[in-house]
Amino acid sequence: MKIDILTLFPEMFAPLEHSIVGKAKERGLLEINYHNFRENAEKSRHVDDEPYGGGQGMLLRAQPIFDTIDKIDAQKARVILLDPAGRTFDQDFAEELSKEDELIFICGHYEGYDERIKSLVTDEVSLGDFVLTGGELAAMTMVDATVRLIPEVIGKETSHQDDSFSSGLLEYPQYTRPYDYLGMTVPDVLMSGHHENIRKWRLEQSLRKTLERRPDLLENYAMTDEERLILEKIKTEIERTDTVNEQNNL
């Protein structure tokens, strides 16, 4: 995969030279190029200007962005504009991007963009309902989430398939040595060596965590009959616990 990032602050992307993304570059699975679009601004070197019609703040000018992208050999690239008004980035979109050969990220750093920049763009994307100073942190997050899904980047394919959201559910609790730490012990089922019981426990824990923390994920989740039965059992247990607590508070 080839990724080009348009930014006024290339130095902010130093963390991408490490960990999984850095290793992917070393192994030739990934190429990342950073383009300071100020270098392509006209003689004034100004990349921003006041909005027509008045208003607060400055807008990113179209010319530096157009000229920078013209110099990138990426006619088939998917061009992503980091914008708070864009679609919310999620695991499904990361999976989608991981199948692309070329990506371009445009990071703004002002009040907004000249609307004409969007004529270059295939996707306007946001991390969520909040505003960042610039698009750099959002771009780093999206690059990291996307690159780790590229085949061969992570050793075992199941390493990311079991992640929260990859299956549609939140991930089950996990433990490592020691068995007992400060009186907190590993659930016995994980020590049993019984693979089927461990699978069922993990599935139940994933469903329970998702129901308690992100019930919205269950609305569009295609459940198996087994999962449906387990979820009903969990709901019944929660209702019983709530009833007991209410009675104790009387």
UniProtKB/Swiss-Prot annotation:
GO MF: tRNA (guanine(37)-N1)-methyltransferase activity
CDD domains: TrmD-like (cd18080)
Gene3D superfamilies: 3.40.1280.10, tRNA(m1g37)methyltransferase, domain 2
GO cellular component: cytosol
Main EC class the enzyme belongs to: transferase
Alphabetized InterPro entries for the sequence: Alpha/beta_knot_MTases, tRNA_m1G_MeTrfase_C_sf, tRNA_m1G_MeTrfase_TrmD, tRNA_m1G_MTases_N, tRNA_MeTrfase_TRMD/TRM10
Primary residence: cytoplasm
Documented EC number(s): 2.1.1.228
Biological process according to GO: tRNA N1-guanine methylation
Substrates-to-products reaction catalysed: guanosine(37) in tRNA + S-adenosyl-L-methionine = N(1)-methylguanosine(37) in tRNA + S-adenosyl-L-homocysteine + H(+)
Cellular location(s): Cytoplasm
Binding site for S-adenosyl-L-methionine: G108, L127, G128, D129, F130, V131, L132
Entry keyword S-adenosyl-L-methionine: yes
Tagged with keyword Transcription: no
Keywords for the protein's UniProt record, in alphabetical order: Cytoplasm, Methyltransferase, S-adenosyl-L-methionine, Transferase, tRNA processing
Family, similarity comment: Belongs to the RNA methyltransferase TrmD family.
SUBUNIT field: Homodimer.
Functional description taken from the UniProt entry: Specifically methylates guanosine-37 in various tRNAs.
Protein name per Swiss-Prot or TrEMBL: tRNA (guanine-N(1)-)-methyltransferase
